[in-house]
Amino acid sequence: MQYLGGDRQRYVRKTRSWNYSIKLEGAMEHNLKDIDVTFPLGVLTVVTGVSGSGKSSLVGDILYPALYRHINQTGSAPGTFRGLSGSLDRITQVEYVDQNPIGKSSRSNAVTYLKVYDDIRKLLSDQQYARMNGFTPSHFSFNIDGGRCPECQGEGFVKIGMQFMADVSMVCESCGGMRFKPEILEVRYKGMNIDDILNLSVEEAISFFGSQDDPVAKRIAERLQPLVDVGLSYIKLGQSSSTLSGGESQRIKLAYFLSMNDSASKSKPQRILFIFDEPTTGLHFYDVEKLLKSFDALLAKGHSIIVVEHNPDVIRAADWIIDLGPEAGDEGGNVVFAGTPSDLMACDASYTSRYLR
């Protein structure tokens, strides 16, 4: 209501300029009409247009695979285009941050993806009871044998095959869904065992670990903060990747890049071009604001961002807009507008312009 009634101030766009750009020439995949498109670097570029106007063809089918091949000398063939030029040396890596699951196994979760679980396992293995019993960090892993429940292999549930229906997941009777052997669950840090910790929300975990004097605990709290920054304070540390929505998986990937240690790459700075496809899907106004602030943090590190998006708040926050259309299908595939959000307002040919007014 605060947003709808205008009582809460929306995100205020930062003004950014750029000195470098790349140019995609002769894009002709699907309905694209042999177009030349310039993408500025070091800023937020938003690609807009009605559904079917050619946005995904331009960014996902041509630009991303073409850049990936240029940088890595391998990869799938891009869609039809004539050339890629400009400040290509200003990009060391290209990342397509999609909504696919964060791990191949259902045991994958946010803390394993962000590598925070290594510190949690170390913290527990350093406790007196663990040392007395010879428990190492590997005993607190649910990916290998040792401390995990042998019945469910660290899943917390078992799948029951149904002959004529989809398999049914049942809580493991052996561990009661706690994933680990009883002796491992006896190890406690400040009264909490591994199951208790994995059932904390991100917000609860930051409060718990951040209040401790132990430097490892404080590091855990710090490394969890990016999940809050992308609007995921509510998810459980041990929540299976199979239960996360596509949008949540995408934001965990964003949190991973926000958590990357800059000091490790000072000798050879990383300049990553991030590509997002409709990252605001399912987000509340407040979460969109957090997403934009996360984009700001990536840009402040010297990276570049291209977003395919319909959300008006994201479009208004752009430094550069590329509007495709004017219609969908055969009537689309042209660059209707390329410029700043303020200049877009004067473009009568753009449906996006009319939508934002």
Feature roles, as predicted:
Residues M1-R357:
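Conserved phosphate-binding elements of NTP-dependent enzyme cores
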